[in-house]
């Protein structure tokens, strides 16, 4: 009984050991979206590992899809047995290259030299896993964007700085701001503040209008400005008062 149990356990391990080392079919390296300038070179990687430890036939095809709709980065499509080439292909799709190997691992890099603007589009790596009973199709896509060789660098940062400066608090015009001269602590008054003073001085130095009398004090050391009188009686009174004061001061 003991030998029979050991024999059964050994048979179980022999039958299930391959399953312990089997892994799911997956991409080990996929192409990524990239942006380059015209005239540059680029490589797009694509590597795949099949499931199980049994040797299969694997095939990689690189396709160029000009106006294809972006799909999932990795997609698994199982076709019916016997229909190995049942793959949905866009009308604008163009096959670039094909590589086929015997085994569980396959890899193929797409190399593009001297890229031009018309090379822009979606590039798709298709892997066909040919098994005994069915064929599995795996796909990985990447977008290639090509910019002009003479295009300026990205200006978003500069535009953001310009936007911040323009949206900041507005200050007075530097021409109207009081700016002290070197060595002079007194600030120069703004231009708009000088305008009323100049107009006042001009009006005070102008001759009086008709009907108005001006009495100028001629006392020594007196810096008093002109005094205007509109009433004739008041004018005579001030004139007499001025003469009396002058006589008193001289005596």
UniProtKB/Swiss-Prot annotation:
Disulfide bonds join 46-125. Residues 1-25 form the signal peptide. Keywords: Disulfide bond, Immunoglobulin domain, Membrane, Signal, Transmembrane, Transmembrane helix. It comes from the Eukaryota. Coiled coil: none annotated. Residues 26-142 form the Ig-like V-type domain. Residues 26-226 are extracellular. It is found in: Membrane. Residues 166-177, 195-213 have a biased composition (Low complexity). This is V-set and transmembrane domain-containing protein 2B. The lineage of its organism: Eukaryota, Metazoa, Chordata, Craniata, Vertebrata.
